[in-house]
UniProtKB/Swiss-Prot annotation:
Name of the protein: NAD kinase
GO molecular function: ATP binding; metal ion binding; NAD binding; NAD+ kinase activity
InterPro entries referenced in this protein's UniProt entry, alphabetically: ATP-NAD_kinase_N, ATP-NAD_kinase_PpnK-typ_C, NAD/diacylglycerol_kinase_sf, NADK
Keywords, ordered alphabetically: ATP-binding, Cytoplasm, Kinase, NAD, NADP, Nucleotide-binding, Transferase
NCBIfam families: PRK01911.1 (NF002521)
Protein purpose: Involved in the regulation of the intracellular balance of NAD and NADP, and is a key enzyme in the biosynthesis of NADP. Catalyzes specifically the phosphorylation on 2'-hydroxyl of the adenosine moiety of NAD to yield NADP.
Length: 288
């Protein structure tokens, strides 16, 4: 029997019935369940639901076969961070607003979950960024993007970028986003970056509020090694990986490249990125 870990976040009360229906369907099938501690607390306290589980988890155990993420894109990114290098397949169940990364909506999840239990699904792989600081720390990974941002609101920073040791440019801006195809519909898009199909092997460098009008987003092959160095009036800058923020001194440079592993996303039905653009982003819709 396949073991399943469930990660999630607090949801609106009207979604409670759908959440319970999904977990009960897994219980009825005899599926060994491991539920994230914070999410289990929500189920018990807010929904008065006490599922039969094999264990309470804070991090993802190695023996898990599948992961189910119940939430929006933020919860999905947090779950992807938990999966790390293990490449355990993850199913995203959307209980948030946009849910661009999630596969199924909450109200239909209990009907489709049988396909997961029967092995009737496909796997879609997504590329990841590997981010290394030159201070000798271990690599970190991001599904969507790595963003270098200024720490002080009143001044810009300068981000010097090199591609495969070839100097590219100095970005005088509020920051610089390096996004994967998955992240091209996230922070990068708000900076007028292009949308990149998930199967494309590219990264996009998107400046945030650049001082120069000719500093446009740039698409590069994902076998490119990107080196970023920061110059700022402040002694520090922010490095943000899929919403996880840390402060670094300006003398710390960043190396970005394609990670050697991928994120494996479970698709319970035929998936069309074009349909996702139309449905989630109102692509081509005549909105008046």
């Amino acid at each position: 029997m396949k073991k399943i870990a469930i990660f999630g976040s607090r949801h609106k009360s009207e979604q409670g019935a759908s959440i319970k229906a999904l977990i009960l369907k897994l219980e009825e099938a005899g599926t060994p369940l491991y539920i994230e501690r914070k999410f289990l607390s929500f189920l018990k306290q807010d929904l008065d639901f006490h599922p039969a589980i094999c264990g309470v988890i804070d991090t993802l155990p190695e023996h898990i076969d599948y992961v189910i993420c119940m939430g929006g894109d933020g919860t999905f990114l947090r779950t992807a961070h938990q999966i790390g290098v293990s490449q355990i397949p993850v199913l995203g169940v959307n209980t948030g607003r946009l849910g661009f990364l999630t596969d199924v909506d909450c109200h239909e999840a209990s009907e489709l979950i049988t396909r997961l239990l029967d092995g009737d699904f496909t796997i879609e792989t997504r590329s990841l960024l590997e981010v290394t600081e030159d201070n000798g720390s271990s690599p970190s990974y991001a599904l969507n993007e790595a963003a270098i941002l200024k720490r002080e609101t009143g001044s810009m920073i300068r981000v010097n970028a090199c591609l495969n040791d070839d100097y590219l440019a100095a970005y005088d801006a509020d920051g610089l986003v390096v996004a994967t195809p998955s992240g091209s519909t996230a922070y990068s898009l708000s900076g007028n970056g292009p949308i990149i199909m998930p199967a494309c092997r590219n990264f996009v460098l998107t400046p945030i509020a650049p001082h120069s009008l000719n500093m446009r987003p740039l698409v590069v092959p994902d076998d490119t090694v990107i080196r970023l160095e920061v110059d700022s009036r402040s002694r520090n800058y922010l490095l943000v990986l899929d919403g996880r923020t840390r402060t670094l001194p300006c003398d710390t440079s960043i190396l970005l490249k394609r990670a050697p592993h991928t994120l494996r996303m479970i698709r319970l039905r035929p998936h069309s990125f074009a349909e996702t653009l139309r449905r989630k982003l109102m692509w081509g819709a005549a909105v008046r």
